[in-house]
Amino acid sequence: DWVTGFEKETGCKVNVKTAATSDEMVSLMAKGGYDLVTASGDASLRLIVGKRVQPINTSLIPNWKNIDPRLKDAPWYVVGQQTYGTPYQWGPNVLMYNTNVFKTAPTSWNVVFDAQNLPDGKPNKGRVQAYDGPIYIADAALYLKATKPELGIQSPYELTETQYKAVLDLLRAQQPLIHRYWHDTTVQMSDFKNEGVVASSAWPYQVNGLVNEKQPIASTIPKEGATGWADTTMLHTDAKHPNCAYKWMDWSLQPKVQGDVASWFGSLPAVPAACKESELLGAEGCKTNG
């Protein structure tokens, strides 16, 4: 609980609205009535371009100094030398797998992209999933970067027309293998427990949740590498409570708060000191979460 302490210390009242997807968050911000949003990287630039969020003054946020240097001035929230929010949490898009099927961790993303028999001798068709979001295009591009070097992919996030076509061809060829395109973490966790799904891209949140339930689940980052995500706390253009909003952004960058959030979600804190200053996260929490 990182809200009650904030309310007691500042006198501000926090009202929370949750959303299942980035598209839903963008829609909610378009309707208005919110002061802040924790926007993922596939929503933050849409909010900036759509003028739904405003630049912030980082000098009004004392804990700004705590932020991981790798996340400062990142292109998903800094545009035209203006800063549109504070880093919240980040993490990798891992390959989650069933340890009863894979006695050793799969070394390649090919287990979800290419038709094949898995180590238990059964086909992967109908037993793998893919993420239902734009980042999965980059996931596929990263796989092709390693497996089809003749395409000349340098960055999975910046593709030529030829490279983009090759990625779409891969995704279309993958479609018959897919059990479900997931976007809801609880549904994906249920699919791994009850629907025979044995491999998929996922977040550490699902992995940790299933492991805590004693499910035969683990995760890995295959040899081709992995993409990632980063959430940013952003201030609505028409925020009615900017003072409390600034206090919340500052509060959210405290090492203990960052560590507690990382422990709850299975993510990585935007503040490195959080790796050592949260009892909930623990000494090995950052390593466990990726």
Model-derived segments and spans:
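Short, hydrophobic alpha-helical packing/hinge segments within bilobed ligand-binding/sensory domains
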Residues: E24-V26, S44, Q188-D191, V207, ...
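Hydrophobic residues within well-ordered alpha-helices
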Residues: M29, A141, D191-K193, L235
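Paired acidic/hydrophobic, glycine-rich loop segments that form the ligand-binding mouth/hinge
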Residues: D35-A39, Y181, V198-W203, A218-S219
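Extracytoplasmic ligand-binding site segments that recognize negatively charged/polar headgroups
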Residues: T38-M189
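A ligand-binding cleft/hinge motif common to bilobed small-molecule-binding domains
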Residues: A43-I48, S201-P216
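Periplasmic-binding protein-like
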Residues: N66, L168-Q174, E213-T237, G282-G285
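Mature extracytoplasmic/periplasmic domains
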Residues: A226-T227, D231-G290
